[in-house]
């Protein structure tokens, strides 16, 4: 039906007759000549219809936006002064010699001249995807997956599929359950990740595995979360953490160079403890120059209890963010930041403006100066390397509150004041705690199959609170691109971890018996990592949501406006599955 794509026509085609198919992007009637902007996946080309061919001209005149058409015409150079350098095809135009309307279009429910609501865009996704910005992102995504496959297969990785219907296992989020018709009362679960299957593949001797795979999590959604998402999943045997990090860092560096012509350079490594201390986050955005600086030791003896209390508390923290040029902040801005840190449990936000660093207390402006004295103020200024024109923002509370509140404030101030430096800042975060503790119960910070760093099973059981995991996260511009770890390959160690997590031997046998069995039969050391493909493509394309780099995403309520999923199953289907529904309607609150 066609000889070329619209967007591929250029000066080398001048003098050739081409046949193109696509959609009418725009129709213009200028002085008796009709111009059609014809669009397909590869771009837009201008087609000109002359009134000399009356019947053809009338057909062209009847075209409207999004009519699907086939055209035939002669490629020619645009007249002098009409070259459009903003178009890839802007040097040429096509003189129309033929025109077939393949299908007409109703009036569009989306308006190309304004921002449409996301609900409308998702309801008519097939129209939304016709927009060049959207189709370009999907094309970019396809090239990313192709480059990933090429890189990994060139390094000896095998693309192996794992089951979509599996068993429910505790991985941190709720499972999507699928009822079994043949096993009454039993359910499959859609996989939250291929974690256990890829470990079993390593125990099978597959050595290097990868898969670009759908994963499913029934969790509360945010801008960067979807109920179904895609992972670049990787696992290896007989390689340690550093080797896995080297392979996967090489893959991402290769990808950025190939797709964006960006050299990311070698990724620095930072411990979890350093990341939290300096940036208040385990995924720090290193484009932001602001840091949290500890000053508790300087403030232990001040009369100001707001500072001295946490400074003398083993679980407290007093830290400062120095904002270059921030002395020009208004009181209103400071009050807004005070309200902001309150979201994270902070009781207030002390501040100090440095108007003149050489003028002692006279050069400082702050309601807390009277509690500090000149010597303490000098020490604080020296510690944070303050300059004239800066403002210091203080956090004083429990270490958890200060770290979280100032970490969030650092990001907000950096964005508000446009302080970000450079376009891309990757790093590895390593040495995570093995467990988190809440109310005396331990929880795996990553997942329960992560190996501890340099500990025997006995040492781990004796001191789980201080155990570090052999885990590593790749972070780019404050987003976690991927996370991985060395896995447990010893049955005794795995049993100890289950025990620490409060999983009884009976529960472990029911949920993970197959894994514990596999660990008996010469399971090799293995390690891996998984990247979020959607998030990676979002960052690389500059999209603001992963929904904008997925063909058919769900809404933030995990619904599909296009197909109206999830839907209601028929009574016959439910009966076949031995399922009875009992939906309790919430009572409306009574008016009092």
From Swiss-Prot:
<feature type="binding site">
    <location>
        <position position="446"/>
    </location>
    <ligand>
        <name>L-aspartate</name>
    </ligand>
</feature>
<feature type="binding site">
    <location>
        <position position="480"/>
    </location>
    <ligand>
        <name>ATP</name>
    </ligand>
</feature>
<keyword id="KW-0436">Ligase</keyword>
<dbReference type="InterPro" id="IPR004365">
    <property type="entry name" value="NA-bd_OB_tRNA"/>
</dbReference>
<dbReference type="Pfam" id="PF00152">
    <property type="entry name" value="tRNA-synt_2"/>
</dbReference>
<comment type="similarity">
    <text>Belongs to the class-II aminoacyl-tRNA synthetase family. Type 1 subfamily.</text>
</comment>
<comment type="function">
    <text>Aspartyl-tRNA synthetase with relaxed tRNA specificity since it is able to aspartylate not only its cognate tRNA(Asp) but also tRNA(Asn). Reaction proceeds in two steps: L-aspartate is first activated by ATP to form Asp-AMP and then transferred to the acceptor end of tRNA(Asp/Asn).</text>
</comment>
<feature type="binding site">
    <location>
        <position position="217"/>
    </location>
    <ligand>
        <name>L-aspartate</name>
    </ligand>
</feature>
<comment type="subunit">
    <text>Homodimer.</text>
</comment>
<dbReference type="InterPro" id="IPR004524">
    <property type="entry name" value="Asp-tRNA-ligase_1"/>
</dbReference>
<dbReference type="Pfam" id="PF01336">
    <property type="entry name" value="tRNA_anti-codon"/>
</dbReference>
<dbReference type="Pfam" id="PF02938">
    <property type="entry name" value="GAD"/>
</dbReference>
<keyword id="KW-0547">Nucleotide-binding</keyword>
<feature type="binding site">
    <location>
        <begin position="532"/>
        <end position="535"/>
    </location>
    <ligand>
        <name>ATP</name>
    </ligand>
</feature>
<dbReference type="GO" id="GO:0005737">
    <property type="term" value="C:cytoplasm"/>
</dbReference>
<feature type="binding site">
    <location>
        <position position="226"/>
    </location>
    <ligand>
        <name>ATP</name>
    </ligand>
</feature>
<keyword id="KW-0030">Aminoacyl-tRNA synthetase</keyword>
<dbReference type="InterPro" id="IPR004115">
    <property type="entry name" value="GAD-like_sf"/>
</dbReference>
<feature type="site" description="Important for tRNA non-discrimination">
    <location>
        <position position="81"/>
    </location>
</feature>
<keyword id="KW-0648">Protein biosynthesis</keyword>
<dbReference type="InterPro" id="IPR047089">
    <property type="entry name" value="Asp-tRNA-ligase_1_N"/>
</dbReference>
<dbReference type="GO" id="GO:0050560">
    <property type="term" value="F:aspartate-tRNA(Asn) ligase activity"/>
</dbReference>
<dbReference type="GO" id="GO:0005524">
    <property type="term" value="F:ATP binding"/>
</dbReference>
<dbReference type="InterPro" id="IPR006195">
    <property type="entry name" value="aa-tRNA-synth_II"/>
</dbReference>
<keyword id="KW-0067">ATP-binding</keyword>
<dbReference type="GO" id="GO:0006422">
    <property type="term" value="P:aspartyl-tRNA aminoacylation"/>
</dbReference>
<feature type="binding site">
    <location>
        <position position="171"/>
    </location>
    <ligand>
        <name>L-aspartate</name>
    </ligand>
</feature>
<dbReference type="InterPro" id="IPR012340">
    <property type="entry name" value="NA-bd_OB-fold"/>
</dbReference>
<dbReference type="InterPro" id="IPR002312">
    <property type="entry name" value="Asp/Asn-tRNA-synth_IIb"/>
</dbReference>
<dbReference type="InterPro" id="IPR047090">
    <property type="entry name" value="AspRS_core"/>
</dbReference>
<protein>
    <recommendedName>
        <fullName>Aspartate--tRNA(Asp/Asn) ligase</fullName>
        <ecNumber>6.1.1.23</ecNumber>
    </recommendedName>
</protein>
<dbReference type="InterPro" id="IPR004364">
    <property type="entry name" value="Aa-tRNA-synt_II"/>
</dbReference>
<dbReference type="GO" id="GO:0004815">
    <property type="term" value="F:aspartate-tRNA ligase activity"/>
</dbReference>
<dbReference type="InterPro" id="IPR045864">
    <property type="entry name" value="aa-tRNA-synth_II/BPL/LPL"/>
</dbReference>
<dbReference type="InterPro" id="IPR029351">
    <property type="entry name" value="GAD_dom"/>
</dbReference>
<dbReference type="GO" id="GO:0003676">
    <property type="term" value="F:nucleic acid binding"/>
</dbReference>
<feature type="binding site">
    <location>
        <begin position="217"/>
        <end position="219"/>
    </location>
    <ligand>
        <name>ATP</name>
    </ligand>
</feature>
<feature type="region of interest" description="Aspartate">
    <location>
        <begin position="195"/>
        <end position="198"/>
    </location>
</feature>
<keyword id="KW-0963">Cytoplasm</keyword>
<feature type="binding site">
    <location>
        <position position="487"/>
    </location>
    <ligand>
        <name>L-aspartate</name>
    </ligand>
</feature>
